[in-house]
Regions:
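Conserved GHKL (Bergerat-fold) ATPase module
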Residues: 1-297
């Protein structure tokens, strides 16, 4: 039958793709890929895209409760976020981003290593729910959205991994997030310092390669009389294990935390302490160690 307005698109499906004619599958795909498009999508009389893309709005137009509701929607939780970062950039590429710091890290509860829950969009259309390389490894606890109009809508996962735009987006987000941490450390230090510290995961001299631990677990393993958390930054675990600074701490049985990601040193400087234990970089000149105990003969 003729339409008064608009366009009718008829799709003929092969037998092996019959599932895409099922109502539940069509709604699932619409909500997954087009949940935030600007125009209303109706399916058999049901309004599908009911959640607003608040990341595309100005911060002044978004209420605090809207941030909380959006975080709960994308992270499937009833909790409010610890903090959020909402920003736009137009150089070197155009993007809108809304990132949330959760109150707790799933890795704390034995769920193993988690992937970042930050989705990549182009003009509010989902490109990849978990794009590789979008965030550095140390930011994998984040939840949120990154939307760039400069990305092609038909870009594949393989192209994303080698795309220079994604690397530029990663650099922008990392720098912005470090500034955000710096602001929290200065303006709301007591509120956020301990919580941020508990989100971090790292390898150490007490873990096998690839196995991570937390500051809380580190503190339970501290030797009697040890007053500080010892840490070392570098490009890789292998590099750190060969550090000349490490020998004196291993000789005294002190665990040393390894941080190998971009921005780690800045984050540790902002953190300063966890549970009243100062985080001390072992390659600094002012580190004091007790004398080694000598064997009684």
């Amino acid at each position: 039958e003729p339409l008064d307005r608009g366009t009718r698109i008829v799709i003929h499906l092969k037998e092996e793709y019959a599932e895409f004619s099922q109502d539940y599958r069509v709604k699932e795909l619409l909500r997954r890929y087009s949940n935030f498009v600007a125009f209303p999508i109706n399916f058999n009389g049901e309004h599908i895209n009911t959640v607003q893309a608040i990341w595309s709005k100005s911060k002044s137009d978004v209420k605090p409760e809207e941030y909380d509701e959006f975080y709960q929607f994308i992270s499937h939780t009833d909790e409010k976020p610890l903090s959020y970062m909402h920003f736009s950039a137009d150089a070197p590429i155009m993007l809108h981003s809304l990132l949330f710091i959760p109150r707790r890290n799933p890795e704390m509860f034995g769920f193993g290593r988690v992937d970042p829950n930050v989705s990549l969009y182009c003009k509010r259309v989902l490109i990849d729910a978990k794009p590789e390389g979008l965030l550095p490894d140390w930011l994998r606890f984040l939840n949120g959205v990154v939307d760039s109009e400069d990305l092609p809508l038909n870009i594949s996962r393989e192209m994303l991994q080698d795309n220079s735009l994604v690397r530029k987006i990663s650099d922008i987000i990392t720098k912005r997030f470090i500034k955000h941490l710096d602001k929290l450390a200065k303006d709301e230090k007591e509120t956020y310092k301990e919580s941020l510290g508990k989100l971090l995961r790292f390898e150490s001299t007490a873990t096998d390669p690839g196995e991570t631990t937390s500051f809380e677990e580190y503190i339970t393993r501290m030797k009697e009389g040890q007053t500080a958390i010892y840490a070392l930054t570098g490009p890789s675990r292998a590099h750190l294990e060969n550090s000349p600074y490490l020998e004196a701490f291993k000789a005294r049985g002190y665990e040393v935390a390894f941080f190998t990601d971009h921005g780690d040193e800045f984050v540790l400087d902002s953190l300063s302490s966890v549970d009243a234990k100062p985080v001390t970089m072992i390659d600094r000149a002012d580190v004091e160690l007790p004398e080694l105990e000598t064997e009684q003969k």
